[in-house]
Amino acid sequence: MKGRTVLEVGADGVAIITITNPPLNLLSVDVMLSLKESVEEALPRENVKAIVVTGSGGKFSGGFDVSVFGGSDGRKENRKVGFMSIEFLTDVLEASSKPIVAAIGGPALGGGFEVALVCHARISTSTAQLGLPELQFGLIPGLGGTQRLPRLVGLTKALEMMLMSTPVTGQDAHILGLVDSVAPTDELVNTARSWALQILERRRPWVTSLHRTDKLEPLAVARAILKVTRRQAQKQAPNLRHQLICIDVIEEGIISGPRIGLLKEAEALEELRQSEITRSLVHIFFARRGTSKIPGITDLGLPPRKVNRIAVVGGGLMGSGIATALIVSDYHVVLKEVNESSLLDGIGRVKVNLESQVKRGKMTQEKIERTLSRLNGVLSYDSFKDVDLVIEAVAENLCLKQQIFADIEKYCPQHSIFACNTSAFDLNAIGERTKSQNRIIGAHFFCPAYVTPLLEIVRTERTSPQVIVDLLDVGKRIKKTPVVVGNCTGFAIGRMFFPYSQSAMLLVERGADVYRVDHAITKFGMPLGPFRVVDRVGFEVAIATSNHYVKAYPERAFKPMLISVLQEENRAGESTRKGFYLYDDNGKASPDPDIQKYVEKAQSTSDVTLMKLSDGDIVEMIFFPIVNEACRILAEGVAVKASDLDIASVLGMEFPAYRGGIIFWANSIGSTYICSKLKDWSMTHGDFFKPCAYLVERAAKGASLVRHLNCFCSVLHVEQMEKPLLVFDMLLLELGGGTGLYTPYVFGH
Ligand SMILES: C[C@H](O)CC(=O)SCCNC(=O)CCNC(=O)[C@H](O)C(C)(C)COP(=O)(O)OP(=O)(O)OC[C@H]1O[C@@H](n2cnc3c(N)ncnc32)[C@H](O)[C@@H]1OP(=O)(O)O
């Protein structure tokens, strides 16, 4: 049984029904049936005058357990569609002859919130979280939320809460009229009890949300709002249907009446819950939470040490972004620069970052000064004597980084963590001039560091588990999703992303059209096609990165001619307003009619046969090499879990979350198909496409690409091992086939 409700009747005649499924009191069919039983038991009892519904442990309910959605449950419900929403919640609970009040602490989300909306009044704590975030799973609210929320807060606010999946606090819910009264946690249930009795005595209104109309906009206005919202949703997410379905269901209720709306809602949910999109988004939900669970590290029981003061070395784009992320989350930061003017520039960038947060509504103007007071600019290492963590974020120059690490070792206390924000260099090389290898770790932030939610944490074979646990904790406090990876050129995210532009160049040099490639890829769901990405990054950086990868992975790197040809024409990307695209004063990109001329020049440098490709071919030829690289990363143990790469691809590359991340998507296509395509292309176009051993092995078995590293934590490079090829037995636990097969693995590059 997955949870239940508990019924207790007090001497005052109020029955308390407590949803009990800790820790979040998630709903399940069992909980709902138990709630129904408790309500049906309480209603006819003579000693019950009113009912309060609440959740155990001060948490109302986090909503339905989403692991049952997306077809993973297998349990088929035989009940009629709408049974819970209409026959129970509406016809029994909402229509009850005794007042029912919800007492809400903690989360009241999704189905949990919908139960509360059915009640005749809601009392909450000020910090409770109330909302309908079902759309984040490709679902729509299924227990009446689409009908009741607009009737309680008006259409505009309801649409915002549902389509953005953003909850409101109890305090804000009170202002919106969603909550009738706010009470302190320890008085919550008693306040709800007396409210319920007051409703009975007609001293408080007895409201059935479904029948309210006072907050609903007039029909013509409502229709206009829905039309605009529908258009926006179509524009923002052309590959997704569930937002449009949600809007249709709301409209149906407004035009044909809420009961018809309820039925339409239940039918739509039934269809959506089995969709591939829901399956993918549910996977992303759990995968994201899973990134901070590192076998052999976070299961050691090491509590994170308290990090109070952090030093950031370098106030450039990355350093100032990192400092911003830290001070916004209440850390005290020392920002070190080499001279007065660079320091002023760095602090200036932090201010600009904070102001941009004000413009985006993420911070108030008044908070800027207080936040900035946590930033202390310095020119020497003297104030590093009490820092717990240093994050080095200077330019990608190995000698400079080595010198900084040697310097900070002299000034910092013994316990300080030394983190490096490199996206490229081997951390062992960076720490070569120190004796502190066990406290060196990579903290790879993504630009802009104070916005992008991803933090790639890079460990070497010598980084201590305590240091990893500490950085995970800092990451959590600054609201980043960490992905812990091993040490190698490009780490996991850079390596996975590298083939994105490489394949695109290869395709164009073999006959594809630049803009057709970008169009096919954005249609697939990427926000920017590969050529727009190269323009944004800038040709100089793109070439430097490319050289780095070509050096590290020569056997599979493609050396494009196209960028060099464009560079000869003084094009350098978006910053010069001329790259693959032309850019206007506002940075708006438009195709360049001259581009084909340069493409033909690049094509003429080799004697390849030009291809004709469909959009589907383009998508496969761009993404299968990424899948291939992801497989290498998994096989080498650079990533611990396939789902970590899914999150890395979604947060680091903006791969569409509704496709579940790179490996999840690849599995939906099948390893055999992907491998056979790569094999074919490698015959014609060379080793860039050659499938790696891991992919070939999985494809031969028709197996999933999911494999979890069991417990070994470090990635060893063969060239760094004293006795190469001796003893590195990496136990790989195969979860995909569920056979528990252990395979010895030796790797290197
Ligand atoms: C018919 C209905 O309309 C359909 C629905 O109700 S769909 C569900 C709607 N509910 C939601 O979207 C809520 C999703 N959950 C959340 O936003 C957050 O978990 C929360 C705000 C409730 C709590 O946050 P927080 O305290 O930080 O805990 P968090 O780490 O996220 O979750 C704790 C555990 O519960 C799990 N969990 C949370 N919500 C869950 C859910 N709805 N289903 C399944 N598991 C859930 C998490 O995976 C995590 O598991 P773990 O400990 O094994 O890693």
What is the predicted role of each segment?
Residues 90-102:
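Conserved catalytic cysteine-centered active-site region
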Residues 102, 106-112:
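Gly/Ser-rich catalytic serine loop of serine hydrolases
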Residues 15, 311-313, 733:
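Conserved beta-strand elements of the Class I
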Residues 728-731, 745:
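Intrinsic disorder
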Residues 730-738:
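Conserved class I S-adenosyl-L-methionine
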Residues 3-5, 10, 20, 32, ...:
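N-terminal glycine-rich phosphate-binding loop for ADP-containing cofactors
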Residues 1-54, 91:
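Conserved CoA-thioester-binding segment of acyl-CoA-metabolizing enzymes
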